[in-house]
C-alpha cells in the first residue's frame, strides 16, 4: 500500500481537531509508514492516500510528487464535490483527486458507512449515492412492454435539424385542437349584431367565443356532470368542451386562489367568463339491423348550408333561431337580444330556482345563489342593450333612408341631361313596362339599375358555366354520380327578372333527424340506375342498415367526397349502407349490382372473423397472465382410433364383435383399449337410447356374464376345434371410415365465403397414416380365398411406402 504524504497527514489532523475527534495516534502511526487495521466501528483513516476507483487508479500513477505541489492545499468544499461527482460519469476527468485529505476522508466515509460527528454528518449528506446514480427521472417503459408517444408529436427530435423531416411529413398525425373539434361538431346560437360573412364562406372559420350565447350538442346519450354525476342543472360548457352544473363549476372554481383553475377532466384552463350555456339533445343511435329513413338533400355549389329538397330555399342570409324548419341544418343560428332573454336566460333561471328550492339547506345553496346573481347581471345587460338597441335601430334606419334617397333623387334629376338621349328614351319604355308588373309606386331609377345588371349578367357567366359543367362531371365520375347539376331555370322573382342560369347543385341523402349519416355510394349507384339521377329520386327512402362506417372530416376525405365539403374539419360523420329492396329499386337493378353487394358482404364477414380472432388472442394472452391456459382439445370423432364401448355393445342390427385382431384393431374388454370416458359413461347411463331399442341393458354385476364376447376360460375349453369364434360383420362406413372434418377454418369458424381454410397439420398427418394402414389391411382379408383357389404360394410383395413428409423425391 502506498504511504501517505506528510501534507496529507497534517491536513487530516487539522480537520480532526476542528471537528472534535481524537485521531492523533492514528495520524502518527500512519506517518511512520505503518497502516493499522481498520475496525468496523472506527472511521476510515483520512491520513492514508485515498483509494481511487478502478477507472482512476491507472491514471493517478502517472503523476509524481512534484505534480502534487501544484494544487492548492485548501480548496473549497464545493469544488471538491464537483470534481468527485464528475468522476462517476462516462467522460470523467482523469486528473487525480486533491491530496488535501480532509475532503477525501469525508468522501470515503460516505461510501464505507463509518461513524462521523455531527459536523461531518451534515457535509456527508451532500455526497449521497443518489447524487452519482445518474438522472433522477428514469424511463421504465421497457419494463412494461409499452411505449407511448403523445398525440400530435410526429418526431422526438425537437429543436434539432434531425426532426425537420417529421414536421414536414404529411402522413404524420395532425395536432388535436379541442376548440376546433368542439366548433366542428356543435351548433352555436350567436348574437345577431355581428358580421358572420366569413363563416358562411369558409366552413373551417372558428366562431368568436365571446359572441356565443348558447351551445347546442346532439349526442346519443344525455351527458352527466363529472362533479356531482347527475344530469347537469343550468348546464355550462367550457372552451375545452366539458359540461358541468353551474353551481358545481362555481364551487370548483372557488377552491382556487387564482381567477382560473384547471379543468378536472383535461386540465385545461377554465375561466369563469368563458362558461357558456349549453343544451344537449339526445338522438337515436342507429346500429346494424335498424330501419332508418333518409331524405334527399340539395346544396348549391359554394353554399355551406344543405337543405332538404322539399324545403329548399335560397340561403341568402343566415338562418335565425326561430326558423324551426331549417334551424337543424345550419351551424350558426342568429338570435336577437329578446330571443336570448326568453329562450336562454329565463330557462336557466327557472332551473336554478327549482334547484335552490330543493337544496336550500345544503352547503351548495350559496353557489346556487351566486349563479342566480350572475344570471340577473346577464339579464340586466341584455335587457338594457335591447332597450337601447331599439332606439339606435330607429335612428340608424332613418339615417339610412336619408342617405339612400338623396343620391337616387339626384340621379333621377340629372339622367335626362346625359348625352345619349335616344338610348335612354328607348330603354325607359321597357323600364316602365317591367315596373308596371311589379309595383308602380317604386322610383324609376332603381329598376333601371337592376335591369342593366340583369341584362349584362349572362355574358360573363358563359365561361364559368362551362367550367362548372366540366368540374361537375369529374365529381360524378369520382363519386359515383353523387351530385347532379340543376339545369332548369328558376321561376320569375319578385322583382320581375328571371335568372337565366343556375349554379350546379349537389344531391345526396342524409338522415331525416339531421344526423351526419349519409348514403353509401353503392346505394347511390343503384338509385341513379333506377331513376336516372338523384334529382329524380324519391325524397325519402327507408331501408335496413347493413353497415355503418364512421369517419372524421379531413382534407383527403373532403377531396374524395366533394358533396360533403360544407362539413368543417374534424367533423364526425358516417357512411351508411342500406339493404334497398323493391319498390325503392327493382329486382333488375339489384341483380345488376349483386356482385358489388356480395363483395362487400364478404368483406364484412372477413372483417368480423379477424375481429373475433383478435379478441380471442387478446383473451388468451390476458388469461395467460393470470395463470389460466387453454384446455387441450383432443378430437375423438374417429371411432377406429378411439373406440367407444357403447357404440359396439348396444347395436342390435348386426352381430357384436370386432372384425379382426390384425387389421382394424380388435376391441378388447380391457379398459386400456377404450376411450377414457366410455366405460364410466356407460355405467352411469345404462338406459341409453340405443340400448332401449332391443339390446340388453347392462349393469355392473352382469357385465362379464351377459357379455357376448368369449372369455379367456371359454376359449381354452373350446380349444382349436372352433377357431372362428368371432363373427365377422361388414364394416360400417360411418364407424370404420375416416370422418372428414367439418368445413371450418383454422380457428373453428365457418361462413359461406369461398375462402379455402388451411388444413391443420395434426389432422392431415393422422389421417394420412390411417389411410395408409387401411390400404395395407384391404388385401389381407382376401389372402385365405386366394390360397384356397390357387393353392400356390404368393410372391413376396414389394414394400410399400406408408407416409412421407417430403414433397419432391429425387433418386
Curated annotation (Swiss-Prot):
Catalytic activity: S-ubiquitinyl-[E2 ubiquitin-conjugating enzyme]-L-cysteine + [acceptor protein]-L-lysine = [E2 ubiquitin-conjugating enzyme]-L-cysteine + N(6)-ubiquitinyl-[acceptor protein]-L-lysine
Zinc finger (RING-type) stretch: 225-267
Compartments, record wording: Cytoplasm; Nucleus
InterPro entries linked: MAG2/RNF10, Znf_C3HC4_RING-type, Znf_RING, Znf_RING/FYVE/PHD, Znf_RING_CS
Modified residues (Phosphoserine): 5, 110, 128
GO cellular component, one term: cytoplasm
GO MF annotation list: transcription cis-regulatory region binding; ubiquitin protein ligase activity; zinc ion binding
Feature: compositional bias, Basic and acidic residues: 724-736
SMART domains in UniProt: RING
Biased composition (Low complexity): 18-31, 78-90, 104-113
Protein keywords: Cytoplasm, DNA-binding, Metal-binding, Nucleus, Phosphoprotein, Transcription, Transcription regulation, Transferase, Ubl conjugation pathway, Zinc, Zinc-finger
Example GO BP: positive regulation of myelination
Alphabetized Pfam families for the sequence: zf-C3HC4
Functional description taken from the UniProt entry: E3 ubiquitin-protein ligase that catalyzes monoubiquitination of 40S ribosomal proteins RPS2/us5 and RPS3/us3 in response to ribosome stalling. Part of a ribosome quality control that takes place when ribosomes have stalled during translation initiation (iRQC): RNF10 acts by mediating monoubiquitination of RPS2/us5 and RPS3/us3, promoting their degradation by the proteasome. Also promotes ubiquitination of 40S ribosomal proteins in response to ribosome stalling during translation elongation. The action of RNF10 in iRQC is counteracted by USP10.
Subunit structure: Interacts with MEOX2.
Name of the protein this chain belongs to: E3 ubiquitin-protein ligase RNF10
Record organism: Homo sapiens
Lineage: Eukaryota, Metazoa, Chordata, Craniata, Vertebrata
Amino acid at each position: 500500500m502506498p504511504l501517505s504524504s506528510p501534507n496529507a497527514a497534517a491536513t487530516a489532523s487539522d480537520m480532526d481537531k476542528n471537528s472534535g475527534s481524537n485521531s492523533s495516534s492514528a495520524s502518527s502511526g500512519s506517518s511512520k509508514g505503518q497502516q493499522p487495521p481498520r475496525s468496523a466501528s472506527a472511521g476510515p483513516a483520512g491520513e492514508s492516500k485515498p483509494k481511487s476507483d478502478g477507472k482512476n487508479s491507472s491514471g493517478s500513477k502517472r503523476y509524481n510528487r512534484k505534480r502534487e505541489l501544484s494544487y492548492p492545499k485548501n480548496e473549497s468544499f464545493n469544488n471538491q464535490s464537483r470534481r468527485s461527482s464528475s468522476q462517476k460519469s462516462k467522460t470523467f476527468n482523469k486528473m487525480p483527486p486533491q491530496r488535501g485529505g480532509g475532503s477525501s476522508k469525508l468522501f470515503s466515509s460516505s461510501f464505507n458507512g463509518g461513524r462521523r460527528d455531527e459536523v461531518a454528518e451534515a457535509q456527508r449528506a451532500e455526497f449521497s449515492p443518489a447524487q452519482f446514480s445518474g438522472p433522477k427521472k428514469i424511463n421504465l417503459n421497457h419494463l412494461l412492454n409499452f411505449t407511448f408517444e403523445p398525440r400530435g408529436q410526429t418526431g422526438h427530435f425537437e429543436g434539432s435539424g434531425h426532426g425537420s423531416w417529421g414536421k414536414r411529413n404529411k402522413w404524420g398525425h395532425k395536432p388535436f385542437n379541442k376548440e376546433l373539434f368542439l366548433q366542428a361538431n356543435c351548433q352555436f346560437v350567436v348574437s345577431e349584431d355581428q358580421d358572420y360573412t366569413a363563416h358562411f364562406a369558409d366552413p373551417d372559420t372558428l366562431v368568436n367565443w365571446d359572441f356565443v350565447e348558447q351551445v347546442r350538442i346532439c349526442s346519443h346519450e344525455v351527458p352527466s356532470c363529472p362533479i356531482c354525476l347527475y344530469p347537469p342543472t343550468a348546464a355550462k360548457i367550457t372552451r375545452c368542451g366539458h359540461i358541468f352544473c353551474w353551481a358545481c363549476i362555481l364551487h370548483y372554481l372557488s377552491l382556487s386562489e387564482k381567477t382560473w383553475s384547471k379543468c378536472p377532466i383535461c386540465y385545461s384552463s377554465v375561466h369563469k367568463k368563458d362558461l357558456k350555456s349549453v343544451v344537449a339533445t339526445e338522438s337515436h343511435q342507429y346500429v346494424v339491423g335498424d330501419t332508418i329513413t333518409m331524405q334527399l338533400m340539395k346544396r348549391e355549389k359554394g353554399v355551406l348550408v344543405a337543405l332538404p329538397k322539399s324545403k329548399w330555399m335560397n340561403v341568402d342570409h343566415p338562418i335565425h333561431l326561430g326558423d324551426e324548419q331549417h334551424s337543424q341544418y345550419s351551424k350558426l343560428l342568429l338570435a336577437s337580444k329578446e330571443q336570448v332573454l326568453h329562450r336562454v336566460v329565463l330557462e336557466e333561471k327557472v332551473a336554478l330556482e327549482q334547484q335552490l328550492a330543493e337544496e336550500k339547506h345544503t352547503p351548495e345553496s350559496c353557489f346556487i345563489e351566486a349563479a342566480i346573481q350572475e344570471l340577473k347581471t346577464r339579464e340586466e345587460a341584455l335587457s338594457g342593450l335591447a332597450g337601447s338597441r331599439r332606439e339606435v335601430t330607429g335612428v340608424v334606419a332613418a339615417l339610412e333612408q336619408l342617405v339612400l334617397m338623396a343620391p337616387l333623387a339626384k340621379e333621377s334629376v340629372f339622367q335626362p341631361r346625359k348625352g345619349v338621349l335616344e338610348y335612354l328614351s328607348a330603354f325607359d319604355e321597357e323600364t316602365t313596362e317591367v315596373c308596371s308588373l311589379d309595383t308602380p309606386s317604386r322610383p324609376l331609377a332603381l329598376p333601371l339599375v337592376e335591369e342593366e345588371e340583369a341584362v349584362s349578367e349572362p355574358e360573363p357567366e358563359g365561361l364559368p358555366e362551362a367550367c362548372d359543367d366540366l368540374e361537375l362531371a369529374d365529381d360524378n365520375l369520382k363519386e359515383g354520380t353523387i351530385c347532379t347539376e340543376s339545369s332548369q331555370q328558376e321561376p320569375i322573382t319578385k322583382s320581375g327578372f328571371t335568372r337565366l342560369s343556375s349554379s350546379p347543385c349537389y344531391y345526396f341523402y342524409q338522415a331525416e333527424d339531421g344526423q351526419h349519416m349519409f348514403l353509401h355510394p353503392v346505394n347511390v349507384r343503384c338509385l341513379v340506375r333506377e331513376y336516372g339521377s338523384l334529382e329524380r329520386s324519391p325524397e325519402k327512402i327507408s331501408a335496413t342498415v347493413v353497415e355503418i362506417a364512421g369517419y372524421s372530416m379531413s382534407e383527403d376525405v373532403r377531396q374524395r367526397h366533394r358533396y360533403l365539403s360544407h362539413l368543417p374539419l374534424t367533423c364526425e360523420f358516417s357512411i351508411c349502407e342500406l339493404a334497398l329492396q323493391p319498390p325503392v329499386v327493382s329486382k333488375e337493378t339489384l341483380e345488376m349490382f349483386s356482385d358489388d353487394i356480395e363483395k362487400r358482404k364478404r368483406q364484412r364477414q372477413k372483417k368480423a372473423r379477424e375481429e373475433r380472432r383478435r379478441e380471442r388472442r387478446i383473451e388468451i394472452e390476458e388469461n395467460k397472465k393470470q395463470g389460466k391456459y387453454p384446455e387441450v382439445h383432443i378430437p375423438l370423432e374417429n371411432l377406429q382410433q378411439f373406440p367407444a364401448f357403447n357404440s359396439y355393445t348396444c347395436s342390435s342390427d348386426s352381430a357384436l364383435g370386432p372384425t379382426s385382431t390384425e387389421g382394424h384393431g380388435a376391441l378388447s374388454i380391457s379398459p386400456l383399449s377404450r376411450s377414457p370416458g366410455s366405460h364410466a359413461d356407460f355405467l352411469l347411463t345404462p338406459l341409453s337410447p340405443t340400448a332401449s331399442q332391443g339390446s340388453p341393458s347392462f349393469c355392473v354385476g352382469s357385465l362379464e356374464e351377459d357379455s357376448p364376447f368369449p372369455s379367456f376360460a371359454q376359449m381354452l375349453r373350446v380349444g382349436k376345434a372352433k377357431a372362428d369364434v368371432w363373427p365377422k360383420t361388414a364394416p360400417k362406413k360411418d364407424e370404420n371410415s375416416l370422418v372428414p372434418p367439418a368445413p371450418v377454418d383454422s380457428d373453428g369458424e365457418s361462413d359461406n365465403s369461398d375462402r379455402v381454410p388451411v388444413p391443420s397439420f395434426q389432422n392431415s398427418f393422422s389421417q394420412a397414416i390411417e389411410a395408409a394402414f387401411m390400404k395395407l389391411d384391404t388385401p389381407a382379408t382376401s389372402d385365405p380365398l386366394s390360397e384356397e383357389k390357387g393353392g400356390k404360394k404368393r410372391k413376396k410383395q414389394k414394400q410399400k411406402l406408408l407416409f412421407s413428409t417430403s414433397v419432391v423425391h429425387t433418386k
